[in-house]
Amino acid sequence: MSSSQRAKETVVITGGGGYFGHRLGCTLHEKGVHVILFDIRKPDQELPEGIHFVQGDVRSLSQLEDVVAGASCVFHTASYGMSGKEQLHRQKIEAINVRGTENIIQACINTNVPRLVYTSTFNVIFGGQTIRDGDESLPYLPQDAFVDNYSRTKTVAEMFVLKMNNQELKNNSGFLRTCSLRAAGIYGPGEQRHLPRIISALEKGMFLFVYGDNPLVQFVHVDNLISAHILAAEALTSEKKYIAAGQPYFISDGPPVNNFEFFRPLVEGLGYKFPSLRFPLSLVYFFAFLTEWIHFFISPVCDFQPILTRAEVFKTGVTHYFKIEKATRELGFEPQPFTMQDVAEWFKNHGYGKQDKKIKSNYLIWDIIFILLVTVVLLSWLPSSE
């Protein structure tokens, strides 16, 4: 697409207040596209002049209709419940990920928006089983096989998005073309979700062990994911013969890497020691299961942050990686090489890193003691067999 064509475009990015949505918006703005960011919270970063931010909620159809009217493409990146304690807020996850996606599709139809690119996840296929060189021909994970509501709802949403491809727009003005990008774990300078949790664990002395049997996984640098989204939007146009319409694509940096070794440059670059202790996956999974069980009972009075959830244990401790040939062949996606060293340098330059103070490793000990005590109390409530 030429720069003059882009200058005539208006795009809306749901989830535009988040790390990826904001970065995608800035990149499109630099290419001359008129960008509107839509989110329930404002971006942490300064907005370049010319980018518009609209505060709103994907659970409101009327708000979505107002913001997407006149747009030529919507990037639906908004979601909830990817990690941490958010993963245990089941009703909110359902409302945002499923009903929010239904709303944005309906808003596009009602206001004649012809294209929608949906940001999906590996988790629509992966649920703890080993996958090597998977591709888009693999079936969705059965609904009763998910251990977390985020992955289940992202699957329901993706299925709906692809089903609504070629849906007729209002007043017979054309058709809605949709596609889905199944992204690997995102990383990059300033990433706001996963990397800060790892750094927080380092600061508290809680990153003491790894687990699993050489788990091979994939990641995607934010700039590569941005490139994939822009290419996907173009592949939904008549100029590209709508080649991406109704299609899912796996998106990553390419070759799989050991999940924990991938973060070694970050850990050591910030001055911490990389752990040498390795636990069995089953033991860590049981601990995560116990943590979730306790959270279920006491979250009304103490909505604590779990160290790990079951889905996170699977995601980080079980081998799963996918081919990106379809995205390369149909979208022209060619991931550029990036390293975690650059990311570590960014965090170091922004004040992160080991300080000249004693690491409070007893955080982990107290968390374990807390979980054990609550378990004892809960077990004491169970009826006896007598």
Curated annotation (Swiss-Prot):
InterPro entries: 3Beta_OHSteriod_DH/Estase (IPR002225), Lipid_A_modif_metabolic_enz (IPR050177), NAD(P)-bd_dom_sf (IPR036291). CDD domains: 3b-HSD_like_1_SDR_e. SUPFAM superfamilies: NAD(P)-binding Rossmann-fold domains (SSF51735). Its EC number is 1.1.1.-. Gene3D superfamilies: NAD(P)-binding Rossmann-like Domain. GO terms for biological process: steroid biosynthetic process. Belongs to the 3-beta-HSD family. This is Short-chain dehydrogenase/reductase family 42E member 1. The gene is sdr42e1.
